[in-house]
């Protein structure tokens, strides 16, 4: 790959990023497709997120990926959010277009697409998800956006339980036709009942 005065750049921000395989993957892709871009990784702490994002815009960055701990802050800074990013309250991908930040969250999209490719479309299905962290929340939101009729969320009674309840409220307020129920993961009988309740149209 030959970098010149016209080479555009994309990047990853967050902390830590030294272990990330994204630069190798994207730079290989740019090279194979003969695109004049480079992908970098910048270690950015939460308190430096706004400053870093402003710098990326000023430098003409085409877009960037976001990892922890910056995802929520970047969602707050974005000019526009996709439906998923707005419901999740976090971004992992930002497209910079005409000086504006367009925030997306692709975690749930990837998971739900993989289900569909393997014959499990979530539309009109009953979904049971164990967990309420970032990835689980993204899956719950994307399942709702793609037409799931009911979502059961099970999570331990820890700091993420309130997040599960908040996600349920947001989904029901923003996505018509879907019901979301939250239960403690410690309630094994309830978990058994909800999984047993599911029919051939269900996904766990």
Predicted regions and their residues:
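Glycine-rich phosphate/diphosphate-binding loop of Rossmann-like nucleotide-binding domains
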Residues: 123-199
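Conserved small/polar residues in nucleotide/adenosyl-binding loops
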Residues: 201-204
């Amino acid at each position: 790959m030959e970098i010149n005065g016209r080479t555009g750049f994309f990047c990853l921000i967050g902390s830590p990023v030294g272990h990330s395989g994204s630069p190798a993957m994207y730079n290989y892709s740019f090279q194979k497709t003969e695109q004049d871009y480079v992908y970098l990784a910048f270690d950015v702490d939460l308190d430096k997120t706004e400053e870093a994002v402003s710098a990326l815009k000023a430098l003409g960055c085409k877009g960037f990926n976001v990892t922890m701990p910056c995802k929520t802050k970047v969602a707050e800074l974005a000019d526009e959010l996709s439906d998923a990013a707005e419901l999740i309250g976090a971004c992992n991908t930002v497209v910079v277009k005409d000086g504006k930040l367009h925030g997306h969250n692709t975690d749930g999209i990837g998971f739900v697409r993989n289900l569909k490719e393997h014959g499990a479309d979530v539309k009109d299905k009953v979904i049971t998800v164990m967990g309420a962290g970032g990835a689980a929340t993204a899956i719950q939101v994307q399942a709702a956006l793609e037409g799931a009729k009911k979502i059961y969320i099970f999570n331990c009674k820890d700091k993420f339980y309130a997040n599960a309840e908040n996600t349920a409220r947001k989904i029901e307020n923003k996505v018509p036709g879907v019901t979301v129920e939250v239960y403690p993961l410690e309630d094994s009988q309830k978990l058994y009942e909800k999984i047993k309740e599911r029919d051939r149209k269900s996904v766990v």
